[in-house]
Amino acid sequence: MNRLSAHIGYLYTDLPLAERPAAAARDGFTAIEHPEPWALPAKEMRALLADLGLTFSQVTSGMGDAGKGEKGLAALTGRETEFRAGFDRALDYAVAIGCPFVHPMAGVPKGGVLDAAETYRLNLSWALSRVEGSGVRVLVEAITIPGYHMGSLALAAQLHDQFHGRFDLLFDTYHATVLAEDPARWAAQNARRIGHVHIADHPGRHEPGTGALAFDRILTALRDHGYVGAIGFEYVPSVATSASAAFLPGWKRLLSEKVSS
């Protein structure tokens, strides 16, 4: 069955970072993820994961200056040295804790579009060479933040083809819907490209069941087209996190039925 991954940057934020993995395990999640878990040294994180029977799904590299709304460094011309240092830090952490993916966020470039595109391609190429032999793969995600360089699922898929599938896509149901895509249809057509999934309902970006998305269709599309990776929950809880996760038993039953059918 697919691992169900709690994004502990969004969930359990009332708790210290070190206490969030245990809370996720108690509520029935089988994996966790966080963009910048550096406050917990890799040795401590690995021990926590082993004790709780969890895996770590994906980590982000090079977020840049959050106060300036950079949202990543990969497409920011002139920041290549900082990008590489951040990527190496994330890759080392991922290898140490057995995490399969690093997501180098593209960011919100301030310069020309062509310069940003060239910088992004060069940084992505460098990152792909860096992960060779590590057991870790690179993720690329289309994100609907205004000005974000990788803001199109079509562009992400095109880039995936141009790089001959050397990285995987992070598919987010909320962002897909904002981009006027049918998440189930897109997942069916592109499942071979997907390495990780993020779940949030739309509108509102809250837990499943609070919006209009037909998650049964989305899960069926992923299942029928061979997706076996983790399903991450990157939503803003509309209630306390544990209460918001009440859907988990039903999702586990659904996924178990689909796997056994």
Predicted segments with their positions:
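Hydrophobic anchor at the start of a short beta-strand
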Residues: 4, 32, 56, 138, ...
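Histidine-acidic metal/acid-base catalytic patches
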Residues: 1-28, 38, 50, 98-100, ...
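Structural motif corresponding to the early beta-alpha repeats
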Residues: 15, 22, 30-119, 233, ...
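Active-site acidic/histidine proton-transfer and metal-coordination neighborhood
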Residues: 73-168, 258-260
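Short, contiguous strand/loop micro-motifs
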Residues: 7-8, 31-33, 76-79, 113-115, ...
